[in-house]
Amino acid sequence: MLMYLLKYYPKILFIIEGTLVTLKYSVIAVILGLVIGMLLAICKVNKNRVLRLFANFYTSIFRGTPLLVQLSIIYFAAPYIINIKFNVFMAGVISFALNSGAYVSEVIRAGINTVDKGQFEAAEALAIPKFLIMKDIILPQAINNIFPSLVNELVNLIKESAIISMLGEMDLMRRAQIVSIETYNYFFPMLIAACCYYILVILISFIAKIIEKKMIVN
């Protein structure tokens, strides 16, 4: 192992640099997914039946089909369906965000349901607009309750983002594949990529625990 590290040090750095690409996809997608998830969750708890049906249908589609299929449709089929050609980055971010939004919506919906309904009724009795009730009273409490689940979604996105290598994006996985081919050694490059993913997950989990403790104190 040590001999390999010394011999292929530049190539190892080449693999590690892919961490930034992986993080870029994951962070942008989880932020967009959080926005989509919030909107869908609000639709799911809305009294309007059409909004509930739409949100549930959306969730069933994106949770019921593989992420790789969704990515392939957006990248390869979109030019024929909507006459728009997405580059690899846009296709990746869109597919990851849409998929993440479906899962996040269920997490947020569950969080909203954990908030005491009496708070909503009391706010309505004070004639507070429903939008402000949801924004200022319900959602902040729901986010506190579901923060660990949202962190898990980010962790899952980091690992699932490896499929973007199928489109040639130079992420961790793609760089490890290139080095594997160049060195005729598949074990060590993949091991290095796995270690990078693992370290990312550990760091994010550690930071999340610190944030969660501060949220509990506040």
Curated annotation (Swiss-Prot):
Ranges of residues in domain ABC transmembrane type-1:
19-208
Protein family membership: Belongs to the binding-protein-dependent transport system permease family. HisMQ subfamily.
The membrane topology term of the UniProt record is:
Multi-pass membrane protein
SUPFAM superfamilies recorded for this chain? MetI-like
Q: Where in the cell is it found?
A: Cell inner membrane
* Keywords recorded for this protein, A-Z: Amino-acid transport, Cell inner membrane, Cell membrane, Membrane, Transmembrane, Transmembrane helix, Transport
**UniProt entry tagged with the keyword Nuclease:** no
- Gene transcribed to yield this protein: glnP
Entry's transmembrane regions: 25-45, 57-79, 86-108, 187-207
InterPro entries named among the record's database cross-references? AA_ABC_transptr_permease_3TM, ArtM/GltK/GlnP/TcyL/YhdX-like, MetI-like, MetI-like_sf
| Pfam families associated with the record | BPD_transp_1 (PF00528)
Task: Extract one GO molecular function annotation from the record.
Answer: transmembrane transporter activity
Q: Know the name of this protein?
A: Putative glutamine transport system permease protein GlnP
Name the major location: membrane
Biological process, per Gene Ontology: amino acid transport
